[in-house]
């Protein structure tokens, strides 16, 4: 039995200009292809989660600051640890982006060489 959800309907296979696209060349998904809960999950960025944790940290430190000297030093240590975690997370994220760019360049270089080889081979 074939799964119907993987088949392209005639409306999804056509662009706004009316030209049809083959399923093999359609690499990008439209936001209407996903349900609303997945769309909100995919649209959130890393910075949104960082700002949410930052607001929770300031609320916690404000509540603990009035308790005395021990709790305020503990809250400042906690804030320092969270700032280090956030900087480590951003460094990891930027490292992943750099690695992805390098991999993309390497793949593009290989494809370019293959295409030039095929073009030269066809000329012979």
Swiss-Prot record:
This chain belongs to the protein called Small polypeptide ROTUNDIFOLIA LIKE 3
Q: Where is this region: Required for DVL/RTFL small polypeptide activity?
A: 92-124
Q: Does the keyword Membrane apply?
A: yes
Question: What does the record list as GO biological process?
Answer: negative regulation of cell population proliferation; regulation of cell population proliferation; shoot system development
Keyword Glycoprotein found: yes
Predominant place of localization: membrane
Q: Which gene encodes it?
A: RTFL3
List the keywords (alphabetical).
Cell membrane, Developmental protein, Glycoprotein, Membrane, Transmembrane, Transmembrane helix
């Amino acid at each position: 039995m074939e799964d119907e959800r993987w088949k392209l309907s005639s409306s999804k296979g056509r662009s706004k200009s009316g030209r049809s696209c083959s399923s093999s060349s359609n690499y990008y998904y439209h936001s209407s292809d996903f349900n609303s809960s997945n769309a909100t999950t995919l649209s959130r960025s890393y910075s949104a989660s960082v700002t949410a944790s930052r607001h929770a940290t300031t609320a916690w430190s404000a509540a603990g600051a009035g308790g005395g000297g021990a709790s305020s030093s503990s809250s400042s240590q906690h804030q320092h640890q969270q700032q280090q975690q956030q900087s480590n997370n951003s460094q990891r994220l930027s490292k992943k982006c750099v690695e992805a760019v390098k991999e993309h360049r390497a793949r593009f270089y290989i494809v370019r060489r293959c295409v030039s080889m095929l073009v030269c081979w066809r000329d012979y």
